[in-house]
Amino acid sequence: MKQGKLIRRAVSAALAGCMMFTLSVPALAESTDALMQLSTAAKSAVSVLGEKNGTLKIGNNSFDTETNINEQELGGGTISYDAETHTLTLNGVNIEDSSGDWVIDFNDTDTLLNLVLMGENLLKGKGGIRAHDLKISGTGSLQITATNYEGIAGIGQSGDNLTIGSDVDITAMNGCAIAFNGSVRIEQDATVKAKCLYGGIDCYDLTIDSATEVNLESTGEQCNAIYVRGDNDGTVAGTANIKNSKLVLKSDYPA
């Protein structure tokens, strides 16, 4: 299968350059049905239509992305938002909300959302976080449980981007852990763990640089722990660069 060969070549080339990695067998499975992994990712593109650009939803609360949110209590912790730098700070929150599709939804296609973590933070809902361009940093940690959709997702447009520089743990019962139609970067000693039905990471361009550990488990049949593609159809290989990082992958079939 041409698609499978392209994907295997790209991933194999990336893994060959790793300074340190550990593979759990079976790992990096070849998917014979790429649409399975893209089905819930498409939810992002469809549901964003008709929504007002420039809104930040946190649980059942809705805010304007150009208005500051002074520190306020939420979910047993506090949240705050700096509209000038578009920085959302979570400090020890435990937010469980299924009133919408996403616990945190940053609907601004022109702006990077800086998510800063302090303390231990927990999010649980249909989907975890959706944003077109997202950077996660801070000394805290984030645990996401998504019952219906992705743990962290873009909006389904080309150019979606995610950077993770903090500890993140994702459980996605019926979707991908991370799905972006663009780049995903894990860095700065971050530990990222995920257990999901579909792809652990599904993106066009993957970089893992100096991460403490990236541990991904995909439980679905014919699904990948890492699925790097160059287009929506999965017929073009994407790019993966991994170095100075420990990588542990488990999926349905061996590579």
Regions found by a protein language model. Name each.
Residues 6-13, 20, 28-255:
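A composition-driven surface/loop motif
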